[in-house]
């Protein structure tokens, strides 16, 4: 079996602590409240040393007329605790509502989205039992910068924003992550054969920074053929770093190749704050049926425990989860 997420080290992790750590929790929408309730119950039983502040965000706040889906007092909690465990939320359909995930990432400066994609063969079916890939996704720029406008009634435009500081932060984070976790290779995905300025800048920065890590192999792939290789032979990759849009799409694909999108958690890391979550959505049609699997959010919480210096609890929780799926208790 692949290494446990509990053993993963985060370059931004705090030192080991025995005092309760303040965190902010949002129970979310759809299946969010039930999987958050299960996750918090597990953390409590495992002895997690946490001081929880709860905030209300998402659909209910949107429908009260707040287009951002989050109120000022919630921002105060996030800036105070600097650690956010978030269940999935629902953004109402229609114009005028902003993506809360994008808003939180940009407001708190969460520049790195880290998604471990690990196979749990033979307990979770996969064609790639040796898969152990970490995708490091730039989290603030690219087409997700939110710079859209209408040129005419029939022409809409979305600008792709790539900056040198943004590239430097995410690429260096990927190499530091690889070094800290005894990984062997960092691979860059981009499309600079077409987008020569934007993706070209990302590629150049990758090549520049890779020279500071001579013990690590550095290579790069055009994203389309790289995606095909990831689907066919994920064992060929170790740590992947890429701009926002590619990372959003391929991290879901990689999680499904490993076994299931529903099992994957992620961390969103900034210089001062961090957010942890499942990578799946709020699944409102499954809400209230007691069938939602909390594993994705639980894995996000495990990454959070490592981040706040409670790797002992993280290992305890993850070992219990492994025993559970070994016993066949999973959806």
PLM feature segments, named:
Residues 62-160, 245:
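N-terminal glycine-rich phosphate/adenylate-binding segment common to multiple enzyme folds
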Residues 51-54, 181-190, 213-221, 310-318, ...:
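Flexible, glycine/charged-enriched surface loops at secondary-structure junctions
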Residues 49-72, 228-230:
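N-terminal beta-loop-helix "entrance" segment that forms/cooperates
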Residues 29-32, 82, 136, 174, ...:
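Buried hydrophobic positions in well-ordered alpha/beta secondary-structure cores of metabolic enzymes
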Residues 8, 61-63, 72, 122, ...:
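Glycine-rich phosphate/nucleotide-binding loop
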Residues 22-28, 84-88, 186-192, 299-306:
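Short glycine-rich or small-residue beta-strand-to-loop segments that form or flank ligand, phosphate
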